[in-house]
Amino acid sequence: LSLRGVCATDKLAGNEKISGMAERKSKPGARYMVGVNGDFFYTRGTTSRGVSTVGTPYGSTIVDGVIYRARNNAKEYKNFVVATDGSLYADPFFFSGSIVAADGSQATVGGINTYSGEVPASNVDKVTIYNDLYYGATAEIGAGCEVAAVLVEGEKFETAKPFKMKLVGNPSTAGD
């Protein structure tokens, strides 16, 4: 018997019954039988482009090392954690990070898959990283400057480990 995390629809936002998640994730030798909602989540709302945010967890969410959402300065939110050694605990999850350019200059990372001005974890004047688990587009029209980047071949985007990215686009304030 083991305890595993699941994110509804395997995306940041989305509604899915616990029974649906259990059925979708079960496979021979690993049957999901019991589920509990482990976070508070948005029950309404859309992005500036009209994409639903319903189902988005308020807190930081990491499942099997995959970062769905990481909020900087969100110390008052407790997260239920299943550690890699199987131990369980509930504690605030504080995310922090920085980006170091080839020339050595640095910028603070404000979050992963969060939006600018998100209270209490504001990303103003910080770098936000969006991955393919976000709402399909950043929806941050005019909120900052965006530039597309991809992981360097062989790199993994996972918790508590550095990774390298390569810029593949020009900066833009148009969003997406």
Please identify what each model-predicted range represents.
Residues 1-176:
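Gly/Ser/Thr/Pro-rich low-complexity, intrinsically disordered segments
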